C-alpha cells in the first residue's frame, strides 16, 4: 500500500497469496525480500517482491522443531542473524549465515 504525499493510504494491493498457509510475522531484508513466518505449515518463506516468487527457507513438516513459527526478525550488530519465535514450544530459533542482512529499522523522532 503506497502512502500518499498527504500521509493518507493509497490503493490496497495483495502482495502474495498463500493458500493453505497461516502467515504471521514478517521482516524485510536489504534486498527488499519479505521473510514470512508461517504458523502453519511450520515454515519460513522468502518472498521476492520483484519476481513475485516465494521460496522455502526452512520447514518442519512434522511440526517437531520449528513448531509454529510466529515471528521473524534480523538481529546482531550486522543484522545477519535470523531469529524466529515459535508459539508452540515457546522458544526463539537462531539461523546464522542466512546470506543477507535485515533492513535497518526506522526510528522516527516524534
Predicted feature locations:
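A short beta-strand motif characteristic of beta-propeller blades
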Residues: 10-17, 53-62
Amino acid at each position: 500500500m503506497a502512502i500518499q504525499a498527504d500521509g493518507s493510504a493509497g490503493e490496497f494491493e495483495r502482495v502474495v497469496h498463500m493458500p493453505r498457509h497461516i502467515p504471521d510475522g514478517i521482516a524485510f531484508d536489504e534486498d527488499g525480500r519479505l521473510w514470512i513466518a508461517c504458523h502453519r505449515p511450520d515454515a519460513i518463506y522468502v518472498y521476492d517482491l520483484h519476481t513475485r516468487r516465494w521460496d522455502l527457507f526452512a520447514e518442519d513438516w512434522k511440526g517437531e522443531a520449528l513448531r509454529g513459527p510466529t515471528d521473524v526478525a534480523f538481529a546482531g550488530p550486522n543484522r545477519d542473524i535470523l531469529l524466529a519465535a515459535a508459539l508452540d514450544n515457546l522458544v526463539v530459533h537462531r539461523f546464522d549465515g542466512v546470506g543477507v542482512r535485515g533492513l535497518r529499522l526506522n526510528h522516527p523522532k516524534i
